[in-house]
Amino acid sequence: LNSTLPNAIIMNYGDNDTFPLWYAQEVEGVRKDVRVMNMSSLGAEWYIDQMRIKSNDSDPLPFSLPRSKYTYRNETVLIQELFNRPIPAKQLNEWIASEDPRTMLPMTSGEKMDFLPSRQIAIPVNKQNAIESGIVKPEDAHLMVDTVYLNINPNKHYLTRDELMLIDLLANFDW
């Protein structure tokens, strides 16, 4: 906790990693500005709801998807590749958040299901914020890329709720 930047987010994958950090924050008062996020719980809507509210001195996580898009009926988002090019993550979030029937796939049951129209996701890098926050040293600025690209495996046919929320977080986290 003490080695992180102010208002950092620590992502881990289990209770054995999470509970000692929470203990340090809640009982010993260590770095209450840092948000500890247990990725194995990020698939639960109640946990996403908790991450969306202020906790101690930690701001809410900047998720943009409305609750209706990650509740019990939306455990997965299908991948139907309409575009063979990178789509900005914020634009993908807007696509998923939309209730426009054109952004959904019809199912045999008659229901419509959200889907991602590309396997390639582009996440712009705010270089100035990365330098000002201390993530990147000013003398290394020339080494920074403008965009980080995520490529979803061609054998993967859907994203789980936790994967979708991680993309949402990356889309709205201004480095």
Residue ranges and their predicted role:
Residues 8-22:
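Short periplasmic/luminal acceptor-recognition loop of GT-C membrane glycosyltransferases, typified by
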Residues 1-7, 23-175:
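ER/secretory pathway lumenal C-terminal domains and tails of membrane proteins involved
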